[in-house]
Amino acid sequence: MNVNIRTSPAEGLNASMNLYGLKTDSLALDTIYFNATQQPDKILFNSGVIANDKPFQEAFDITLNGDIGADKANATIEYLNGKKECGVNIGMVAGLQKGGISLHITPFDPILVYRKFTVNPDNYIYLRDDGRIMANLSIYDELRTGLSFYSTPDSTAQQDLTLSLTQINIGEFKRVIPYMPDIEGVINSEAHYVQTEDGMDQISLENNINQLRYNGIALGDWALSAVYLPKQTGEQHINGLIMQNDKEVISIEGSYFPAEEKEQKEDRIDARMALHHFPLEIANSFIPGKMAMLSGDIDGTMQMSGNASQPLMNGKINLDSVNVYVPQASLNLRFDNKPVEIKDSKLTFNRFKIFTKGKTPFTIDGDVDMADFSQMKMNLKMDANNFELLNAKQTKQSLVYGKLYVDFHSTLKGTPDNMNIRGNMNILGNSNFTYILQDSPLTVEDRLEETVTFTNFSDTTSAQRRVLPALSLGGIDMLMTLHIDEGVQCRVNMDEKGSNYMYFEECDCLSNILRKETSF
């Protein structure tokens, strides 16, 4: 990094800053620079970010140039790709006026996502000192893709603002926004804000995203509709719904009651939410590497009432044909369709079952007290007898394959920072499975390697040892016992071909003890 700042009566303030070779795990910027030069009536500045072409990113050059004067400022941003094609060129001029600040978009033919747009020549956004906003702005291309932001004079309202987005293709922005997530879809949206003469704010929103995709997985067409309406009594009411493929999947309605000095000492809330066949498949796009695949949907209702800081929750959740598939183990977990009830903020599992291919389930019994989200109290018991944890043939994706049968008994009690876990697992004798140790640091090859080693005997006593911070696992007190029956065949392949491997045989007792004070 280079920083140079100079001041003098003759030349004023001059500054420059350069940062080279900024790198993180997923970010690589070759040059970041900023320069400022003072002139008699204004300060000129130019800045930018330069990234060269790399295997994980395309080259780009982003610049932000402009000037700042006593009563006026302007800035222009430009984006060039590796071929020096202009993806963005748009600016804004801000001017101080009596009673507020006026903003204008320049030029009248800006470039966005490599296309020319047209801005109305009389465009403005006026921010008044009294908080009111007046606007008349429209930016559209030949296909009527773009946005508009305008105010409507209304004698019955202090402010009446509308923001409209038309045919905005989200995926196109990946071409001009480095490191943007892999998301696609077409947005059509309209937001309306009204402030009445008595200062009440009203907001309505209609939003549609068609052909939504994330990480290459199609999520369908989505729509959001919401209304915010305050009342004279102080109540703030909201009503909304979310639809997927023209079917309602989430609805919400509720009110927030701010505290009053006499009758009410604390803020209150009264809200209801309902899930209508909410599809779990949408979670698959957010799971890295398709490590797990969800299917099925959720139905249920939830009501929150009482103090806003610690509301009481009541309702139930129904899992409808919910399955979780883990490709690396060819494991399919099927969840019980029995409703899970929530009463007075206590989530109760009444012998809730999880099945695999086998006949005997994994059972969860107990409850989770969610009255205080920061200190949720858990009291759970988990049991399984002759549970078929694994029954799969080897595939290209397999990390583990074969057959694995277990008896499992465990209890989990306490809060997240004071958790007590006790239990045992017995691997039954009819188990025969193989685990593939990928990217293993262990090797049995090259036995003659390092027969001769060259050592640098230079003095290293002055070198300070790097102290790594201790990794605390919180307030967990765990004692788990593992028993491997006679007859269990457990093989660990050191590579994918299985040319090097280890066998594990009968073991009377292996204990894993983790105390609260343990740090690594």
What do the predicted segments below correspond to?
Residues M1-H192, T196-T301, S309-H409, T415-F520:
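Interface amphipathic segments
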